Amino acid sequence: MKLATLVLVLALPAAAQAPSTLAPTGTLRGVFLGSNPVQGRVDTATGDATGPVPDLVRELARRIGVASNVIPAPDAAGVIAALNNGTADIGFLAYDETRAREVDFGAPFAVMLNSYLVKAGSPIRASADVDRAGVTVAAVRGQTQELFVSRTLKNAKVRVFQTMPPQAEVERLLTSGDVDVFAINRQRSLEAEAASGAKLRALADSFLEVDQSFVVAKGARAKLDAIAAVMKELNAAGFMQRSIDRAKLTGVRAPGVK
């Protein structure tokens, strides 16, 4: 490469160099947890994805001048698989050390709170009341909350579900006493409380505050560097907090926002 050409390439802004790094196919393919409202929601009728992650993927694609494709995955394992088999370029997950063995994590795009859900008449009033003998805590396998409670609770029993039960089953499990607590994110806890007709109650405090972050396939750190350059501009402009507010999410905030 001639010296003049090399100087020109090095002088290009990161966003100008990002297309080949982030979207080698010409389309930025972002995979996210389609069942997690903190990241986004998928309209079952149209298939359209809305929310913070879809907004972010589309804005990143616009800024680097490529098309975008937002891909919902059923769970964290699906996000990781899509990255490592090359069907997605970037993904989004809450940080956990076990996941970091399979994918590389970048900077957070949001901070998520997690709150236990109990039946309305439960004597459990705060997160500190949960880890006691005789208490059964439900969680969904592989989700951030399950990884946390399985690792940290010493006295309570953890009951792991393969998938998130529907609202009616969550109500039955809690009100019947089959389980005493459901460990989910705050947005889901509040939605379940609201839908229950006063049968359920989300605890007021958070048992875990966790970063929602960009993830890429192992060894693809160059993608995270390219994303960081664009995200610096987006964060300065308040892009993520506006997206979170537009989605009417509770217990979620952009990094640096109190």
Briefly describe each language-model feature range:
Residues 77, 93-102, 148-151, 175-208:
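A ligand-binding cleft/hinge motif common to bilobed small-molecule-binding domains
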Residues 18, 144-164, 201-203, 232-258:
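Ligand-binding clefts/hinges and TM-proximal coupling segments of bilobed small-molecule sensing domains
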Residues 34, 111-121, 186, 194-232, ...:
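Periplasmic-binding protein-like
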Residues 48-64, 122, 128-136, 143, ...:
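Extended ligand-binding regions for polar small-molecule ligands
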Residues 54, 58, 62, 67-131, ...:
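Acidic, polar ligand-binding/catalytic clefts
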Residues 32-37, 46-63, 115-166, 187:
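Bilobed "Venus flytrap"/periplasmic-binding protein-like clamshell domains
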Residues 7-16:
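Hydrophobic h-region of N-terminal signal peptides that target proteins for export
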Residues 18-94, 163, 226-227, 237, ...:
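Extracytoplasmic small-molecule ligand-binding "clamshell" domains
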